[in-house]
Amino acid sequence: MTNDFHHITVLLHETVDMLDIKPDGIYVDATLGGAGHSEYLLSQLGPDGHLYAFDQDQKAIDNAHIRLKKYVDTGQVTFIKDNFRNLSSNLKALGVSEINGICYDLGVSSPQLDERERGFSYKQDAPLDMRMNREQSLTAYDVVNTYSYHDLVRIFFKYGEDKFSKQIARKIEQVRAEKTISTTTELAEIIKSSKSAKELKKKGHPAKQIFQAIRIEVNDELGAADESIQQAMDLLAVDGRISVITFHSLEDRLTKQLFKEASTVEVPKGLPFIPDDLQPKMELVNRKPILPSQEELEANNRAHSAKLRVARRIR
């Protein structure tokens, strides 16, 4: 693994083990990142098994070529540089119409956070960027400097759940009328100055929720996850499984709702039985999310908000 792409994988064994790996199966890592889940999954595959790994960050793929070299050499892994919202079309283009399992590790990866110039972190001074795919045009700079007051309030409330959304949007509007807002430090200071003294005393960085909101907007993270998870459930073979790690309430709520819709059925009252074509296609493997162990929490601070949900295809 390259030194500039260090990443501690969260819920490593739980996420992969819950897929109930078949040695000759076809699997997908929808969020390659530091390749931790991919490496562990590949270690359980036989010579006829295969892994397709998605990431829209070329650096992640370059790193994985090094970390997973022995599996690259045996032809057991295929890397796909694309947003996982294009999961189905990419796999079908490669002749894959059915998979035995898929895992997701949602949100931004540690290497992206740690790479200062990517502009994801409110802890380091950097240009406002926040693109997971550096080839796309929309950046955090565009959101902060061109979105209307009402659009800023909308995304701050919806994606950041910050009760000071209106005050922050108004302050951004005032500052950018005088000059453009170019850096993460400038934005973090604006956010901080928009909050009450009482709020600033609370635990956690005052800019965290707003940075999350802008990042989700720039990358359409929830829209992409929604589309991809639905495609994944359609691609699963019977008895195939899907594991999803989330890191904040919006991701977890979305995953929980998608799994619920696929594992329950609404039928007209008085119907004596549920016809086969109305039966749910999925079942929940775990009713409540799996959380990191105390040992993992002590070893990896990023694991604190992680939740793992798993579902299985039943028809």
From Swiss-Prot:
Organism: Streptococcus agalactiae serotype V (strain ATCC BAA-611 / 2603 V/R)
Family membership: Belongs to the methyltransferase superfamily. RsmH family.
InterPro entries cross-referenced by the UniProt entry: RsmH, SAM-dep_MeTrfase_MraW_recog, SAM-dependent_MTases_sf
Assigned keywords, A-Z: Cytoplasm, Methyltransferase, rRNA processing, S-adenosyl-L-methionine, Transferase
Enzyme Commission number: 2.1.1.199
Gene3D superfamilies, per database record: Putative methyltransferase TM0872, insert domain, Vaccinia Virus protein VP39
Pfam families with a match to the protein in the record: Methyltransf_5
PANTHER family: 12S RRNA N4-METHYLCYTIDINE METHYLTRANSFERASE, S-ADENOSYL-METHYLTRANSFERASE MRAW
GO molecular function: rRNA (cytosine-N4-)-methyltransferase activity
Official protein name in the record: Ribosomal RNA small subunit methyltransferase H
Broad EC category: transferase
A GO-annotated cellular component: cytoplasm
Positions bound to S-adenosyl-L-methionine: A35, G36, H37, D55, F84, D105, Q112
Function field: Specifically methylates the N4 position of cytidine in position 1402 (C1402) of 16S rRNA.
Places the protein is found: Cytoplasm
GO BP annotations listed: rRNA base methylation
Catalytic activity as recorded in UniProt: cytidine(1402) in 16S rRNA + S-adenosyl-L-methionine = N(4)-methylcytidine(1402) in 16S rRNA + S-adenosyl-L-homocysteine + H(+)
SUPFAM superfamilies assigned to the protein according to its UniProt record, in alphabetical order: Putative methyltransferase TM0872, insert domain (SSF81799), S-adenosyl-L-methionine-dependent methyltransferases (SSF53335)
Domain of life of the organism encoding this protein: Bacteria
Primary localisation category: cytoplasm
